Curated annotation (Swiss-Prot):
The lineage of its organism: Bacteria, Pseudomonadati, Campylobacterota, Epsilonproteobacteria, Campylobacterales. This is Urease accessory protein UreH. It comes from Helicobacter pylori (strain G27). Belongs to the UreD family. Required for maturation of urease via the functional incorporation of the urease nickel metallocenter. Disulfide bonds: none annotated. One of its GO terms (molecular function) is nickel cation binding.
């Protein structure tokens, strides 16, 4: 049963406003979701923060998020704080997210890390539909648990799926299953002693693989790599023993990308 009286829903649709910048065309949300009004930290790049007025996800919580980024919009979406998945007892919490990025639009989706508490069970499914000219930075950071309490990999199960389509053709699929009951999370093929994991996908972004690799190599305390996926798009996987190194790495890559995207003609 959902903690709230109904399924938690968030709808956001953007367009280009009269001043040529990205604005909110339409939005709708139910508890605990809220939206901050967009602000413009750089040129025509808008930033919108998604708010969740709650202590975190509980047993039975169901979230349905739909984001429609209009043509020519340049938008960065962030979250309010680290997301906590509490003890879900014998159930689970879930989120289904659908994102559409329109023609010549740019989306940088940069939420804070996800922290599964002891006995937490979370299912996440994200589908992103792109136009051939859309540009995307999408990331997730997963934490081993409440690291400061030495609560490492005590969660029940965490399963996230990311599907990216370009002109209705699949170009990327990620199926992350973390199940400490059946897998040694400290195995060298898993976290290998690290506690934080970054997954970052870049589609049609004006940054070279060599530049991303250089960012990774210059990041202290980070063990990671970048790969070229379908049609020369990029995927970064990285591990660290804290959130800050991964957040800094992600920000460095995003900054290099947006420097080109937001340049005035």
């Amino acid at each position: 049963m959902n903690t709230y009286a109904q399924e938690s829903k968030l709808r956001l649709k953007t367009k280009i406003g009269a001043d040529g910048r990205c604005v909110i065309e339409d939005n709708f949300f139910t508890p605990p979701f809220k939206l901050m009004a967009p602000f413009y930290p750089k040129d025509d790049l808008a930033e919108i923060m998604l708010l969740a007025v709650s202590p975190g996800l509980m047993k039975g919580d169901v979230q349905d998020v739909q984001l429609n980024i209009g043509p020519n919009c340049k938008l960065r979406i962030t979250s309010q704080s680290f997301e906590k998945i509490h003890n879900t007892e014998d159930g689970f919490a879930s989120r289904d997210m659908h994102i559409v990025v329109g023609e010549n639009a740019f989306l940088d989706f940069a939420p804070f890390p996800l922290i599964p508490f002891e006995n937490a069970h979370f299912k996440g499914n994200t589908t992103i539909s792109l136009h051939s000219s859309s540009q995307l930075l999408y990331s997730e950071i997963i934490v081993a648990g409440r690291v400061a309490r030495n609560e490492l990999f005590k969660f029940n199960r965490l399963h996230t799926k990311i599907s990216i389509l370009q002109d209705e053709k699949p170009i990327y699929y990620d199926n992350t299953i973390l199940d400490p009951k059946t897998t040694d999370m400290n195995n060298m093929c898993m976290f290998d002693g690290y506690t934080h994991y970054l997954n970052l996908v870049l589609v049609n972004c004006p940054i070279e693989l060599s530049s991303v690799r250089e960012c990774i190599e210059e990041s202290e305390g980070v063990d990671g790599a970048v790969s070229e996926i379908a049609s020369s798009h990029l995927c970064v996987k990285a591990l660290a023993k804290g959130s800050e190194p991964l957040l800094h790495l992600r920000e460095k890559i995003a900054r290099l990308t947006t420097q080109t995207i937001t340049q005035k003609i």
